[in-house]
From Swiss-Prot:
PANTHER family the UniProt entry points to: FATTY ACID/PHOSPHOLIPID SYNTHESIS PROTEIN PLSX, PHOSPHATE ACYLTRANSFERASE
GO biological process per UniProt: fatty acid biosynthetic process; phospholipid biosynthetic process
GO CC list: cytoplasm
Protein species of origin: Staphylococcus aureus (strain MSSA476)
Known pathway: Lipid metabolism; phospholipid metabolism
Subunit structure: Homodimer. Probably interacts with PlsY.
Disulphide bridges: none
Protein's name according to its UniProt entry: Phosphate acyltransferase
Reactions it catalyzes: a fatty acyl-[ACP] + phosphate = an acyl phosphate + holo-[ACP]
Coiled coil residues, start to end: none
GO molecular function, one term: phosphate:acyl-[acyl carrier protein] acyltransferase activity
Record EC number: 2.3.1.274
Gene name in the database record: plsX
Location within or outside the cell: Cytoplasm
Amino acid sequence: MVKLAIDMMGGDNAPDIVLEAVQKAVEDFKDLEIILFGDEKKYNLNHERIEFRHCSEKIEMEDEPVRAIKRKKDSSMVKMAEAVKSGEADGCVSAGNTGALMSAGLFIVGRIKGVARPALVVTLPTIDGKGFVFLDVGANADAKPEHLLQYAQLGDIYAQKIRGIDNPKISLLNIGTEPAKGNSLTKKSYELLNQDHSLNFVGNIEAKTLMDGDTDVVVTDGYTGNMVLKNLEGTAKSIGKMLKDTIMSSTKNKLAGAILKKDLAEFAKKMDYSEYGGSVLLGLEGTVVKAHGSSNAKAFYSAIRQAKIAGEQNIVQTMKETVGESNE
């Protein structure tokens, strides 16, 4: 049995989509228990495997992260993180304030001993539909080569345990594929990655080929990773809008759109990274999953499923025994 703590109040569409996702999750997974934290006035579920706990406070999207975690002690996010810290829950999921959730992860759940800096990881789509693991996408704006090596080690475990990939191929995001390309960070990181024979490091990868499906894990610093992630999100939205405008521009195009409706829907599903769940803060003493702030019920459900798999696979213990112990 896996037990997850859920922030009912976090996100643009909370609590409605959270309640819908939680209801579906406990119906689909008979080995899942939920502790739901939020406002009792908004709670309307009744299930034997859902425990509700009232919280008098909520962390808003505009709240300053560290201050909010320290001052709003009875917020749904803080109480959720405390449940993971105490061992009462195996992991947690929230669509709330990203900075506050990362602060809760660091200051409440706690960092694995030996992990220098936790990394935020997402799974992004590829043209072949299998996706790739991408980190760090914003936990740390600055990074040293040693941090990128550790990100690769964390990403390697994540790809194996969560995505079910044996001996995942690991690449370093760079401005060229040649080993000598890049700045001092990428050059030194390349050397360290190449020297770690426990990793299946296959070299540099350029941003233009990220979605080709040639690698399983891509490592970069949080500043670069966050910009790449937002660029991919923005490009996908722009292409979708352009395609819709083109289809609606004439009767001929509308007919073509109707004929291709099923294929276009399949394409949209393939490129929808919410299918893979939320982003995960790796390197902590518990599983912390960040669902997108604008998540619908489907995306939040995927994030719950992702946290459940992490609990089943005991990914935190694996990271302690490998990444943590090797860096003590």
